[in-house]
Amino acid sequence: APRTIGVDINPHAVAYAHAVNGVETVRSDLFSAVSGKFDLILFNAPYLPTLPEERIDDWLECALDGGVSGRDVIERFLPQALSHLTDTGRILLLISSLTGLLETVSLCAACGADAAVCAEEEVEDGEMLYVLKITRSLA
């Protein structure tokens, strides 16, 4: 049977998603508390470059803090997500131009995955948001 599961490290987000949408939710740091394979994995990663001195110990800030490069969480996510992806599955990953589009695509390639922009939108001050469609490399 198809299974939909929402995962977040923020306990407030997990409780809210379950209450509002009624979907199965799990509090987890990425896939640490998740098992199984999935046909589709969606990830709105913390993608904003954040210097150590800019860090605030707050759940909302945690949702945005992508580390110095903006890719710290994405670097941990990709190998884990690929190990939870079915052979024909795909990942949709939201990133920002501040995160580095080419650098993120290169990370995917280093993990044995192909990545292509499937949607983009300018948000403000020239910042672009991209949705990357990521699949296992066939080569």
Annotate each language-model stretch with its function.
Residues 45-73:
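Mobile active-site "lid"/loop adjacent to the S-adenosyl-L-methionine
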Residues 10, 29, 59-62, 98-105:
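A generic short-segment signal for beta-strand/edge and adjacent turn/coil regions
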Residues 6, 66, 93:
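Conserved SAM-binding loop
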Residues 71-133:
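Conserved Class I SAM-dependent methyltransferase catalytic core
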Residues 137-139:
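Flexible, glycine-/basic-rich loop-and-beta segments that form/coincide
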Residues 2, 25, 62-66, 85:
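Short glycine- and Lys/Arg-enriched binding-loop motifs that mark or flank ligand-binding interfaces
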